């Protein structure tokens, strides 16, 4: 069985816990902060900072985090790239006119999924840099708010918000989160292309969350935007359009979380860690278990943890 080990700081453990929220198991592993089981991989993050990736997709999942690692995983021997060449971003894409697409909220127990896409004309790339557009992971919330407010006045964009009640309804009907994301990205891109009214981007770049074949399989029966569409992990570092899309999506998520916190009467934390379990328990005590449907992604393991905490109070 393939495996990789990374050593990462606590801040990255928190980000990983948020990222893998839907896949976190309720199993208790000695010394572990969490264990998650995304497709083809078991990930165990320990309090020591070590993160163990096991399974056929171990190397692929570890690669997402190597840039953040204190001791990167050893280089693997050269092999065929997992993305078919037709979907790999072309050379020089960073200076092209591109639609970039990204999502936020998939690993957060509270709040919606927000998907944004941005058309960044190559003539506007210097302006985007001046506005402070870069990888949103390196920006704090106040910076996100300021830059996003400038962006929405500057670039053509499309934004979709999948709120919790609709999310839970779709999930209970058997739809995976991966399919939801594919549908949202495709719809947002289609909406933006209509806004552009004939202007053709040189490329469409999606921050990769699934293999291209799986992404398009999710869109079976829909009008899929496929021409000049490319996929890459860490796409925010490849083209500013994706970085801008991520900022707008995160801004929207923050605004939605503020609204939900006011509605709940308590501050709802981001992520899927212990603070979230505590907030979930407070929500249950204040509004009853039915309120979880409005505020949370019910299938996360946090639901049962919050119920257990609430039952003891």
UniProtKB/Swiss-Prot annotation:
Protein name per Swiss-Prot or TrEMBL: Ribonuclease HIII
GO MF, any single term: magnesium ion binding
GO annotation terms (biological process): DNA replication, removal of RNA primer; mismatch repair
Transmembrane domains' residue ranges: none
Binding residue positions for a divalent metal cation: 102-103, 207
Species this protein is from: Bacillus licheniformis (strain ATCC 14580 / DSM 13 / JCM 2505 / CCUG 7422 / NBRC 12200 / NCIMB 9375 / NCTC 10341 / NRRL NRS-1264 / Gibson 46)
Record's catalysed reaction(s): Endonucleolytic cleavage to 5'-phosphomonoester
Classification lineage: Bacteria, Bacillati, Bacillota, Bacilli, Bacillales
Function: Endonuclease that specifically degrades the RNA of RNA-DNA hybrids.
């Amino acid at each position: 069985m393939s495996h990789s080990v990374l050593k990462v700081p606590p801040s990255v453990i928190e980000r990983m816990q948020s990222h893998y929220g839907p896949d976190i198991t309720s199993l208790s592993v000695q010394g572990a902060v969490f264990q998650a089981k995304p497709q083809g991989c078991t990930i165990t993050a320990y309090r020591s900072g070590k993160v163990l990736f096991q399974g056929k997709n171990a190397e692929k999942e570890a690669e997402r985090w190597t840039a953040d690692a204190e001791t990167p995983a050893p280089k693997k021997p050269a092999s065929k790239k997992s993305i078919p060449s037709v979907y790999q971003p072309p050379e020089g894409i960073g200076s092209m006119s591109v639609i970039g697409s990204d999502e936020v909220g998939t690993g957060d127990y509270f709040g919606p999924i927000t998907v944004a896409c941005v058309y960044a004309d190559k003539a506007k790339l210097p302006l985007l840099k001046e506005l402070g557009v870069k990888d949103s992971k390196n920006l704090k919330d106040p910076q996100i708010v300021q830059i996003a407010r400038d962006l929405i006045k500057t670039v053509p964009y499309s934004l979709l918000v999948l709120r919790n009640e609709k999310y839970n309804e779709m999930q209970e009907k058997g739809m995976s989160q991966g399919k939801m994301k594919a549908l949202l990205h495709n719809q947002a891109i289609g909406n933006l292309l209509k806004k552009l009214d004939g202007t053709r981007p040189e490329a469409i770049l999606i921050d990769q969350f699934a293999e291209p074949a799986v992404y398009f399989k999710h869109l079976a029966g829909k009008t899929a935007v496929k021409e000049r569409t490319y996929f890459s992990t860490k796409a925010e570092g490849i083209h500013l359009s994706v970085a801008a899309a991520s900022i707008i999506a995160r801004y929207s998520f923050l605004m939605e979380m503020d609204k939900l916190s006011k509605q709940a009467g308590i501050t709802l934390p981001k992520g899927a860690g212990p603070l979230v379990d505590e907030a979930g328990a407070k929500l249950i005590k204040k509004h009853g278990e039915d309120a979880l449907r409005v505020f949370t992604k019910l299938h996360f393991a946090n639901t049962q943890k919050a119920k257990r905490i609430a039952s003891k109070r």
